[in-house]
Each structure stands twice: as structure tokens, then as C-alpha cells.
Amino acid sequence: MNELNELIEQLNDYDKSTRLSAVKKLYRLYTDGNIKKQPVDYEYVNNHIHTTYSFSPYSPSKAVWMAFISGLSTAGIMDHDSVGGVNEFIEAGSIVNIATTVGMEVRVDMSGTRLEAKRINNPDQAGIAYVAMHGIPHGQLEKTSRFIKPYQHERGRRNKLMVENINALVGDYGIKLDYEKDVLPVSMFHDGGSVTERHILYALSKKLISRFGKGKNLVGFLKDRLRIQIIPGLEQLLSDERNPYYYYDLLGVLKSDFVERFYVPADKECPHVIEFIGLCQETGSIAAYAYLGDVDVSVTGDKKKQKFEDDYLDLLFEEITRLGFKAVTYAPSRNTKEQLLRIKEYCGKYSLFQISGEDINTPRQEFICKALKDDMFENLKDAAWALIGHEKAASSDLDKAMFSPASDAKFVDLNDRIGYYKSIGKNALSYM
């Protein structure tokens, strides 16, 4: 058991080769019968797993191992503003023999479109939308990395301004954040990873715990001094000093009700939506809009009650289709059945590819999304295999990408296209 625990720890080691070595040793323990997979009763998939290259408790190696041992049939990496963890993710997937797909999540500027004044799917800022670049062909990763690098730099400039704002809010209480010493070390910036608001809040969480300890003193400070609203369930978790996920629960509370006080609007760090669509077309990747939907109760505890796209879905789908998006990604566990039925209906009306996007970035989230067992989501399982098939085909020849001009000429019906690429995903050698 000590060996197992040591190997699990090594999955998040600073050194990439150590992480991958741990995957190999753990898989050997599995094949020898010393480790069992979690039993599952369905072919579960997930295409939206964050790693330490944006924000997550999991390195790419650990994310793959968690996906494998949890019983996922496929796993997809989706980091914010970074493809730095992609090659490790692919290699780890090949070690444990799990099908993988790779992508990048980006915030885009919607100025000049009919959505520019809307609160779209971004809790912090109107006119800025979260979008996903799915199924990046492996030969296009370097181009994608070059594209996003200047935006990472601009984000760093804004991050420093937000750290200054935080210090102005908490400095009187003996707390001071240093961007270089406190924030960057909890990121993978040194290896091409992005630095996000979550990294800043994680660093702040460490400072708060160091200053006030865990439990009632800290809860009292948050409520009485910072005037942060904490829902009863999260207050109970933060009152428990033995809570193993304390840092992440504290981060969730801060993200829900503190960010708006120090937030600096994003501008230069967000490529224009036209640039993003152009990148997807040039690289043979799939441009997907990330549906959030109006939030009543946040599943992850990091979003307050807030309205997003649901009041203007006609306009939204008209505009994303006009702009060149080919897909919509959504999370079955995060929305109501009524919301999801509407989204599926709109995707069908506009012939948009539907992708499962269960956002994994905290240790409380399960890799298995039980909601996928509902018959209404059968298409998402097929879509995951189609994504994998697209990636395999496009990695050998961009003309073979799922939405290339050649594929557009070949397929009229979207379901025929999905079925074709699904067969490629499940049978790697028999395509085209």
C-alpha cells in the first residue's frame, strides 16, 4: 500500500518523466491484478478534463490515471489558454490504453457581433465568451501554442493588476500576495501552462489559512470582514478543519463572491472570435461554443445564481452558426433536463455537433458523469468516439478532418458524418 501511495503522489511530481514513470508502474500493478478499476455499468466518456496546465488537482498523467481507474472509456484534456500538457496526456493515455482526445479552452472577444453586449457564458464579464477548440490534430499543436503565447503574456499583465487589487482589499489584515513568489509557483507557467484567476485565489487561500487557520476563525473573517456570502453547505465544509479538500472549497467560496471586487476586465488576452475560428479552420480543429445556461444552484459551489444565455437562444445559435462554430459542448450534470432538451433541440435545428463537456477541475468532482446513462445523452457517447476518430484522421491529413471542405462535400447529414468518424475512432487502422 505504501508503494501505491508513493506512486499516486508521483503522478503530480514536478518532473514530467517521473509522472509518466509512475503511470507505467501503476498500470503494471493493474495488469498484475494488484489494482482494480472502479466497476461501471455504462460506456462513460469525458472530453473536458482540466489539468495543472490550467487549474486542477491533476497533472496530465494523474488526470489520465484517474480517468482510467474511474472506468472512463475515453478521456479528453481541455486546458485554458494552453496545450502545454497535451503531449503528456497523449503519452499517458497510450500507456494505460485509454482513447484520448485533446483540446484547448479559450475566452474570445465577441465585439462586432450581435452578442457583444450580452452576458454570454462568462460569469465575470459581458461580451466575452468561453469556447473550446476540440480535436486538435497532433501536428498542429505547435502552431496552436504559438498562437496562444502572446495572449498568455497579456493575461499575466492583468493577473498582476488583480493581485494589486487583492492586496488593497486584504492588506490591512496582514495579508499580502506576491505574484512571482506566491501565484506562479502554484501554476505550470514554467512549462507553457496558463495562470488563471483560480491560481490567484488558490494562492490567496493559502495565505488566508496561514493567517487565520482552518475553521471558525477563517469563516468569521470571510463573513464579518470581507462580507462574503457563504451558502450553508460550504460554511459547514469550511468549519471542518479536517476537510481534505479545504483549499479547493475555500477557493470556490472566493470565486463565487469575491472575484468581482478585484476583477480587471479581460481585453487584450482574449483573441477575437474571428481569429479563433480562423485558427480552428487552419489547424483542422473543431470550434465549439461552451453552453453554460442560467445558474440557479451551482454544482461546484463556485458560481452564484446568475442569468446567462437562456433568454436569447435563437440569437445565440444564429450568431454562432454564422460565425463558423461547428459544435456545442455542454455538461449534462450541470443543467436541468429542460435546459438540456432545449439545447439539444437547437443543436439539431442548426446541425451543430454535440459534445459532452463535464468540466473537471476540483477533487470533489467525479470523473464519471452518471447523467450520461440517460437515453437522451446516447449521442454524446457516439460524439466522443467521433472526436477521437476525427483527431486520428486529421493528424494524418488535414483534408480528412471532420469539418474540412472535403468532408463537407462528402457528408450532407451530420449523423452520417458522426457515424463515419465514430467508426474511425473505434477502429484506428480502417479509415479513408
Named regions from a protein language model:
Residues M1-E3, I360:
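Acidic, metal/ion-coordinating pockets
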Residues L204, K307-D311, L315-F317, I355-K373, ...:
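Repeat-unit-sized solenoid/scaffold elements
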